Amino acid sequence: MSTQPSDSAEPGAAPAAVSTYAGVENTPTVPGSEPDAAKHAEEEPKVVNPTEPQPTAPVDNEPKPAAAPAQEADSPADIKDSVSTTAGELSPLAQLWKAAEGHAHFEIWGVPLSDPERHIPTQIIFQKFLNANEGQVEKAKDQLLKTLDWRQKTQPQQLLRKMFSKAKFDGLGYVTTYTAGDEPAVDEPEQKEVFTWNLYGSVKSLDETFGNLQEFVEWRVALMELGLMEINIGGAIKPITADYDPYKMTQVHDYKGISFLRQTDVAKAASKECIKVLGDNYPELLKEKFFLNIPAIMGFFYGLMKMFVSKKTLNKFHPMSSGTNLAKEFVNTKVDGLGDKLPAEYGGKGADLKTLGKAPIVT
């Protein structure tokens, strides 16, 4: 499985080789770079013609046995109910549902799974797994089942209620939501923009924050689950396709005050683990990723990346030397004045992240 926000890579981790994520495109292992890696082009499922033309019997005068009555064609309703071809091949979505039905854990991203032919939130989730694997059902099924295993073991929804260390994580990450109006239409998901913010300049001690690997990964997963709550796939009524998917989030990684010359083993280990966990279990959730306050040397590194990753992938990564220019990036959006809604620190006129944003619980 290829590995893909979703987000990650922590401060102190030096740029490394480009890695691939199932769902977020080819993401470089650079500070802040996490999933959300991969492949978005989906293969069309093979359509099996239920009726093959039969050769015409030769004409002669010998008596012939009565021909078997022709089988009636399924009605559209029957086809939808069975979600199969006459060859017995289930549709890609139905195959994923059949696999998920046999699992003990029935939830992904806060959504109780159900038949995707009748439950749009499940259709969205399953289609994301297909999109992350270029429409290859077996690969999507493998990733889906492993995600169910991981969620059963980790119980990430419970991390939303966990108390994290204020000394380690306060001010490190936020989730903000900006809408076209007070109550955007539920059938127009494009009228809502969800951001996750990773402020690595707020880290007081790399060893303290990243030293306990499990604790840091749990905090990062809690931030991701908060973002998913804001996207609200469970309330969606508009399905997605291989080419249309508005249920994604923008990720911002701010490195203001971080020295890229400082590299600690614990920070690199935390980055590596986050990339794996988020890439494996949160495919196709990245809309755009902005790397802010990046030193000039990192800008040079991104120039070199053009030699190794596709243009489609690069279009999602935006290294910027100054965070104050971020607001200018949001022109083509259905949320009017989105740039102005961002905090002043990022070129907008909105409230600061501590006032407006949501974050995992710290104490």
Curated annotation (Swiss-Prot):
Keyword set for this entry? Cytoplasm, Endoplasmic reticulum, Heme, Iron, Lipid transport, Membrane, Metal-binding, Microsome, Transport
The protein's required cofactors:
heme b
Which Pfam families does this entry report, sorted A to Z? CRAL_TRIO
Q: Which catalytic reaction applies to this protein?
A: a 1,2-diacyl-sn-glycero-3-phospho-(1D-myo-inositol)(in) = a 1,2-diacyl-sn-glycero-3-phospho-(1D-myo-inositol)(out)
Q: Where is the composition biased (Basic and acidic residues)?
A: 36-46
What SUPFAM superfamilies does the database record attribute to this sequence?
CRAL/TRIO domain, CRAL/TRIO N-terminal domain
GO biological process terms, alphabetically, are: Golgi to plasma membrane protein transport; regulation of exocytosis
Instruction: From the UniProt record, list the coiled-coil ranges.
Output: none
Q: Where is the composition biased (Low complexity)?
A: 64-76
Subcellular location per the Swiss-Prot or TrEMBL entry: Cytoplasm; Endoplasmic reticulum membrane; Microsome membrane
- MF terms (GO), sorted A to Z: metal ion binding; phosphatidylinositol transfer activity
Say which domain of life the source belongs to. Eukaryota
Q: Which GO terms describe its cellular component?
A: cortical endoplasmic reticulum; cytosol; endoplasmic reticulum membrane; plasma membrane
Which CDD domains does the UniProt record give?
SEC14 (cd00170)
Does the keyword Cell wall biogenesis/degradation feature in the UniProt annotation?
A: no
Does Nucleotide-binding appear among the keywords? no
Where is the signal peptide, in residue numbers?
none
Disordered: where is this region? 1-84
Which residues are in the CRAL-TRIO domain? 180-354
Sequence positions that bind heme: Y200, R220, H253, Y255, K289
Q: How does it sit in the membrane?
A: Peripheral membrane protein
Q: Which family does it belong to?
A: Belongs to the SFH5 family.
The record's function comment reads: Non-classical phosphatidylinositol (PtdIns) transfer protein (PITP), which exhibits PtdIns-binding/transfer activity in the absence of detectable PtdCho-binding/transfer activity. Regulates PtdIns(4,5)P2 homeostasis at the plasma membrane. Heme-binding protein that may play a role in organic oxidant-induced stress responses.
Concerning PANTHER family, the annotation shows:
PHOSPHATIDYLINOSITOL TRANSFER PROTEIN SFH5
Q: What is this protein called?
A: Phosphatidylinositol transfer protein sfh-5
Protein's organism: Neurospora crassa (strain ATCC 24698 / 74-OR23-1A / CBS 708.71 / DSM 1257 / FGSC 987)
Corresponding gene?
sfh-5
